[in-house]
């Protein structure tokens, strides 16, 4: 497994400029925070990485904390994130998430999958992304790309992303979990 992941990473880094997913970009940013990773992950659903990055940069220039975003007007947020898919729905959702983080978690993003999936709009994939990119906790975020590539590589034989996550968790040593999503997600670019 290490050989496969290392080979894929080397290939992606050989491209000039090297390729990164939007979430890895958020993670590496000087102003990275669990809040920005969570909101960036919500924005990234069904959206190309370059559009997620564009929207996240615009959004976080003005609304970089849960407190600021919780007080935002939906129309103002919509203008900033217009490049992402379903921006009308996501604008309302991320404001709702910011308000919930303040009321339930004191403005902090929980580092627990069970608490994360209780947040509206946060499923296992988003929760696992937050664990990996915000808290560097071993988890396996599985989206449609990771699901498809895992099946094509013969790592799993599953029908649904949730099944893929569980099979990968069984079959891949935990020490590789942090790299799986980012490495396999880059293959589809």
Predicted regions and their residues:
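Catalytic DNA-binding helix-loop module of base-excision-repair DNA glycosylases/AP lyases
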Residues: 38-43, 94-100, 108-155, 161-167, ...
């Amino acid at each position: 497994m290490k050989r496969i992941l290392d080979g894929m990473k080397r290939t992606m880094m050989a491209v000039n400029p090297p390729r990164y997913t939007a979430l890895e970009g958020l993670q590496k940013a000087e102003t990275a925070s669990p809040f920005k990773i969570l909101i960036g992950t919500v924005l990234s659903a069904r959206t190309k990485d370059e559009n997620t990055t564009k929207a996240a940069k615009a959004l976080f220039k003005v609304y970089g904390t849960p407190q600021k975003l919780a007080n935002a007007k939906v129309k103002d947020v919509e203008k900033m994130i217009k490049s992402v898919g379903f921006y009308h729905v996501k604008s309302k959702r991320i404001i709702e998430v910011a308000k919930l983080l303040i009321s339930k978690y004191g403005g902090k993003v929980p580092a627990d999958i069970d608490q994360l999936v209780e947040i509206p709009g946060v499923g296992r994939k988003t929760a696992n992304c937050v664990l990996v990119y915000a808290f560097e906790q071993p988890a396996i975020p599985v989206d449609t790309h990771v699901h498809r590539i895992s099946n094509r590589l013969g790592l799993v034989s599953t029908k649904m992303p949730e099944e893929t996550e569980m099979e990968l968790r069984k079959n891949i040593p935990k020490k590789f979990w942090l790299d799986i999503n980012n490495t396999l997600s880059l293959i589809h670019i």
